[in-house]
């Protein structure tokens, strides 16, 4: 049985009043993010910080009904805002 999912999943989450579409898939035992894009017309009015990325990861884990440890950390260069 393979635990690698080749299908990319898109999940929409809301963090700090902004809506984000997260593209990623499960690879091995963890869910990995490939791209995060901001949805909506409002420009982001603060920088992408490690704290913000942790909030995004927590919201993503909740949306996927997974433990936060099962979602890999999100790199800042994967976020389009």
Which residues does each PLM region occupy?
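Intrinsically disordered, low-complexity regulatory segments enriched in Ser/Thr/Pro
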Residues: 22-47
């Amino acid at each position: 049985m393979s635990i690698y999912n080749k299908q990319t999943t898109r999940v929409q989450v809301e963090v700090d009043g902004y809506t984000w579409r997260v593209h990623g898939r499960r690879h091995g035992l963890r869910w990995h993010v490939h791209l995060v894009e901001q949805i909506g017309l409002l420009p982001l009015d603060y920088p992408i910080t490690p704290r913000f990325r942790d909030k995004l990861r927590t919201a993503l884990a909740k949306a996927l009904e997974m433990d936060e440890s099962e979602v890999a950390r999100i790199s800042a260069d994967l976020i389009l805002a």
